[in-house]
Amino acid sequence: MVANETKQSQELAKRLWAIANDLRGNMNAAKFQNYILGVIFYRYLSEHTENYMDDLLKNDGISYQEALADPDYTETVKEWSLEHLGYIMEPKNLWGALIDSIKAGQFSIEDFEKAINALVGSTVGQDSEAAFYKLFDDMNLQDKDLGREVSGRTELISKVMLRVNDIPFGVTEAEIDVLGTAYMYLIALFADDAGKKGGEYFTPTCASTLVARLATVGLDEIASACDPCAGSASLLLEVKKHLGKQKVGHYYAQELNGSTYNLLRMNLLMHGVPYKEFTTYNDDTLRVDNFDKKKTEQFTVQVSNPPYSLKWAACLLYTSDAADE
């Protein structure tokens, strides 16, 4: 079963990688990854929302889209979505609606931008705000590299969305494993393409598997797992994979690079980790010890693959840090 899932994930990742290579043109692969990964992630959120809410409403004989349009259901559905998913997706912003708009020749890249802003905006002031704050910022839909005019940018992003839409991937509990793993493989392919710098945000599977197994020897489930140099969360997710579903109570992670920090949160969500079950920080672990607040609740497991190759300068802050002594 595991071997079959791995094969499916690898094949899915290869197809997505082919899309990236076909459509990025002269754009740097490291930059184009923000668009392909962002589009895949948006599709996941949309289809996960519909699947989750439709299942919830099936006994009422009404779909998610119908419920949002029905005054008797609207507020309840929105409150439930915010509480359990962390965000609200309006029917017009669902993946299927955007694809229909593209096929009808009525789509503009500005529609996609508004849809993303609406999703992130729905989390403001909610418990989920930190999980979604500026999550799509690296997917700059106004970037001139996509096209000098709105029409050019619309044409390219439409091609990306249509090609991604042609690839079947599911969002049921079983299918999320395949999709999440494919997402990891795709991140790995971009990391390989980036060369040495790719190691800053992705730990090779063989290394992360070994670390996860060593860190959890004798443990069947854990209250928490922490990675202070999390990158794209590959180590934490390997711990999740090794222990099994619902065996990790909470994930803690910190990552300095802003783009990688966004990828970290996307990756956790893509692997079915609810926003309530992870706490992340976008900071320098050596300079800003956000984990100091957690000293009263020791982490069960800590894993890390620090960026050893990065240059760093001596700082007086470090001389008084017990961790450096």
Q: What function would you assign to each model-found segment?
A:
Residues K197-S304, S309-K311:
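Conserved S-adenosyl-L-methionine
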Residues Y64-A69, E221, F278, T319:
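Generic secretory/membrane-interface signal
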Residues M1-L210, L214-A215, N282-T285:
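Non-catalytic, mostly N-terminal accessory regions of nucleic-acid modification and defense proteins
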Residues A313-L317:
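Short, flexible, mixed-charge acidic loops at enzyme active sites
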